Amino acid sequence: MKETIFNIGYDLITNEIPRGSRVLDLGCGDGELLAELRKKKNIEGFGIEISPKSVGIALSKGVFACQADIDEGLSDYKDNSFDYVILNQTIQNTKRPEYVLREIMRIGTRVIVSFPNFSPSEGT
């Protein structure tokens, strides 16, 4: 069930992003979403992930990813550096959500933020 919900989220995000966009995925994990966007939408993708192990997996998929803490490392990006910045089910893991949200609105022309549902209703 969890995988199905996650894939639905990927489909929703993929449908929003035009072909050839420049995309930054914050909390990119193993790079699965960026790999999917590259395959389906021919995007230029970059990922930031705090876990060195996940960065290694992303790199093995051919996804450009670097290890960094998004609570600290977004100020280096120039204004409107990306067409889209994605924060997919990651905001709850940040220590400074206000900073992160301000920064993604600065560095992305458009932003996509999703939140996990920690208490889904039964039967939906």
Report each predicted region and the residues it spans:
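Glycine-rich SAM-binding Motif I of class I
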Residues: 31-35
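Class I SAM-dependent methyltransferase "Motif I" SAM/SAH-binding loop
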Residues: 27-29
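A short SAM/SAH-binding and catalytic strip from SAM-dependent methyltransferases
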Residues: 86-95
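A short glycine-rich, Lys/Arg-flanked "PGG" loop and its adjoining helix->strand segment in the class I
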Residues: 98-112
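Conserved class I S-adenosyl-L-methionine
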Residues: 113-124
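Class I SAM-dependent methyltransferase SAM/SAH-binding core
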Residues: 36-73
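Conserved alpha-helix/loop element of class I SAM-dependent methyltransferases that forms part
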Residues: 4-20
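Short conserved loop adjoining the S-adenosyl-L-methionine
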Residues: 73-79
